[in-house]
């Protein structure tokens, strides 16, 4: 993790939050380091912060700052040499007919209802399954950086023509795309929407000639976060330096050949 003095952001201040229940590892306490003031964090500054391991939730920019745990490791896909695995190719083929519409961050009631359904099925009891409209908007639709909303729908010729399947929020950085949050139809048990979404972002970054897709934090002990290791080549931010996944990750965490 980069030291504060290494950040070329002298106008910003950083503070640590009080401990709170970790949302990834049960029974653990977490703390975050928050960058302030929010109004100074424009797209250029945010790009630098992301390279230093920060993420954002609405207008709040943060990174893990836990007392006795370092499980959250920033990760990014190197897109130029990326080759999908067999399972990823199957996911791409299964969902390639979905129509993607890129738009500014905008409230749509249909999106909000899908978000509530996703939270109630995939993260029941996590606290977000009862988010109000205001909480939803503050979490996903407030941004001071270069952000996009992408919705994925069934094509007109399908049996479920126009049905909303997935919504993704993405930030455009100087050196890549940053995946903010994605939610999708959780009732389609055989679908691979999450995998397809990452593949779609990688393809977009390649088309834009951006070198990376930032996927947030890789957490080996968390099933919800460990999947990111399936997208190779992956780099991890360790001791302030971006290094190849295979050079720093435990052998057991590496994807099968």
From Swiss-Prot:
One of its GO terms (cellular component) is cytoplasm. Signal peptide: none annotated. It is found in: Cytoplasm. It is an enzyme of class 2 (transferase). Its EC number is 2.3.2.29. It catalyses: N-terminal L-glutamyl-[protein] + L-leucyl-tRNA(Leu) = N-terminal L-leucyl-L-glutamyl-[protein] + tRNA(Leu) + H(+); N-terminal L-aspartyl-[protein] + L-leucyl-tRNA(Leu) = N-terminal L-leucyl-L-aspartyl-[protein] + tRNA(Leu) + H(+). The keyword Acyltransferase applies. The keyword Acyltransferase applies. One of its GO terms (biological process) is ubiquitin-dependent protein catabolic process via the N-end rule pathway. InterPro entries: Acyl_CoA_acyltransferase, Asp_Glu_LeuTrfase, N-end_Aminoacyl_Trfase, N-end_Aminoacyl_Trfase_C, N-end_Aminoacyl_Trfase_N. Belongs to the R-transferase family. Bpt subfamily. HAMAP family: Bpt. This is Aspartate/glutamate leucyltransferase. The gene is bpt.
């Amino acid at each position: 993790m980069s030291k504060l003095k290494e950040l070329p952001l002298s106008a910003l201040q950083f503070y640590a939050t009080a401990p709170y229940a970790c949302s990834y590892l049960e029974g653990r306490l977490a703390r975050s380091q928050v960058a302030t003031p929010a109004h100074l964090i424009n797209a250029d500054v945010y790009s630098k912060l992301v390279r230093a391991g920060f993420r954002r939730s609405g207008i709040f920019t943060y990174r893990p700052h836990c007392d006795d745990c370092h499980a959250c490791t920033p990760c990014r896909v190197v897109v130029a040499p990326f080759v999908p695995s067999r399972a990823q190719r199957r996911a791409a083929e299964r969902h390639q007919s979905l129509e993607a519409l890129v738009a500014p961050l905008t409230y749509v009631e249909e999106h909000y209802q899908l978000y509530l359904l996703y939270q109630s099925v995939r993260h029941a009891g996590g606290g977000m399954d009862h988010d109000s409209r205001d909480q939803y908007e503050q979490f996903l639709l407030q941004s001071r950086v270069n952000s996009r909303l992408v919705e994925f729908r069934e094509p007109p010729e399908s049996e479920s023509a126009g049905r909303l399947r997935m919504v993704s929020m993405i930030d455009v950085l100087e050196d890549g795309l940053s995946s903010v949050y994605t939610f999708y139809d959780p009732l389609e048990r055989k679908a691979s929407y999450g995998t397809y979404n990452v593949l779609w972002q990688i393809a977009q970054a390649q088309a834009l000639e951006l070198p990376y897709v930032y996927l947030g934090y890789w957490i080996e002990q968390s099933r919800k976060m460990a999947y990111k290791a399936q997208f190779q080549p992956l780099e991890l931010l360790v001791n302030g330096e971006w290094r190849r996944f295979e050079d720093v990750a435990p052998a057991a965490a590496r994807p099968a050949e």
